[in-house]
Amino acid sequence: MALEPIDYTTHSREIDAEYLKIVRGSDPDTTWLIISPNAKKEYEPESTGSSFHDFLQLFDETKVQYGLARVSPPGSDVEKIIIIGWCPDSAPLKTRASFAANFAAVANNLFKGYHVQVTARDEDDLDENELLMKISNAAGARYSIQTSSKQQGKASTPPVKKSFTPSKSPAPVSKKEPVKTPSPAPAAKISSRVNDNNDDDDWNEPELKERDFDQAPLKPNQSSYKPIGKIDLQKVIAEEKAKEDPRLVQKPTAAGSKIDPSSDIANLKNESKLKRDSEFNSFLGTTKPPSMTESSLKNDDDKVIKGFRNEKSPAQLWAERKAKQNSGNAETKAEAPKPEVPEDEPEGEPDVKDLKSKFEGLAASEKEEEEMENKFAPPPKKSEPTIISPKPFSKPQEPVKAEEAEQPKTDYKKIGNPLPGMHIEADNEEEPEENDDDWDDDEDEAAQPPLPSRNVASGAPVQKEEPEQEEIAPSLPSRNSIPAPKQEEAPEQAPEEEIEEEAEEAAPQLPSRSSAAPPPPPRRATPEKKPKENPWATAEYDYDAAEDNELTFVENDKIINIEFVDDDWWLGELEKDGSKGLFPSNYVSLGN
């Protein structure tokens, strides 16, 4: 048989209102409630009242009903809640079959918070005394509020022994009377002090008062969780700004003065400016260029692959090494002092355009560029080669050691042809006569080396007093090795030319870009055709030029007119397009 659930949700608001009156005790006239089904089988409040006896008499014999009452058990002032489920035998069968499930639903969902649950099927189960006893037992320990009656003890009289009288009268015996014990005096009554103060229990606690939940309902406990809503960015920014930046906090110095951040910024600017000035001075030759030590050579074994850590081109490194190598020979030369050139002025006037292009990566300011342009003269025209003006004297003086110590090494000028692509620097003011030759074409043709593409300034009309001031201009050096001596550069020259080269070897070499500028090259002369074939080579690998004066070629390209300017770097001309420049010797193989 299917269960038939009851409908108590339709009138749940009315039932809940009466239930709260009973539980809270807000209405003294309502202490019990009975709900019954109507014609639509919907449970609703049927009757209410205040007498527990009337509550037990109003259950109907033909309906399944549920009742709730608030009762004060005897001997206690604590009220308890009792719920009664009435299921008589005369009720419909289907309703009685579903009584247990429906009673549990009513007790758990509708009448919550009861103390005693009773199931009644006839009038015997609704006995008032039995129900009150159940409620009293459910209340737990009971503390009587009635004063216990004092038991009055009756004064016990000692038993009196009867005297024994024999038949024969003996001599009279005296009767001993019992010794009366003195009764103790009653204790004096302690006079009770009448204290009007209600706090006589020494607990100093306020008297408990019954709380009216309608007037002062219980407040729900507030959770400690605070939900995070929309973030106030302005508040967060203000808090962050209020914090002190630890980077700006300066520790007190020994003198107790605070460090100003603006002074630190100014110091950094000054340091960067001094660094740029030192780089300019090293380029102009006012400071001594750093020398290549053995440790640096060991650390930088392959500069072609690793790059130039000192940010200098191969030509500069080679020129520095040559200048250092020939510095001993240059000290023995005697040269008259130059009154027209003061010592504090720079020795050379390098090309301003090349200066700008060289230091473009250093982001030089416009002010510094203007100072450099004002300081140096404009460069000479490239269309016409500059001719070195002769010095005011014709014969060198005797070498003086004191003057040699005062004369800077950069006063010695080089004479020769620079390689293609190298920077040409003009020095017309400080290049008084080091050679007495006029750089005419006849002298160039007479001093031509056996290699066709190389123009060497010969000293045919040069005086015998100054053979050491001429030298063939060197080419770009290798990046990781020291070039071979000058005698190995032209092994095919005639014996007369070798003697002349040895005489010219004592002259100072071509300076680096950081020292005084070299003189401009002489006018190129048309090379004479030699019957002997010039060296040529075939490219074994592809090579891309890293600088303007280098040669770019691919595999199997033919390079002609090779000049062996160094062990690792050669100068040659590409056959297919006629371009000329330096190339690494390990990228090609010689054909003759």
Curated annotation (Swiss-Prot):
Biased composition (Acidic residues): 427-446, 490-505
Positions of disulphide bridges: none
Primary localisation category: cytoplasm
Region Disordered, annotated ranges: 144-541
Post-translational modifications: The actin depolymerizing factor homology (ADF) domain mediates actin filament binding.
Oligomeric and partner information: Binds F-actin, but not G-actin. Interacts with the ARP2/3 complex. Interacts with APP1, ARK1, PRK1, SCP1, SRV2 and YIR003W via its SH3 domain. Interacts with the SH3 domain of RVS167 and with SLA1.
UniProt family annotation: Belongs to the ABP1 family.
Identification of the protein by name: Actin-binding protein
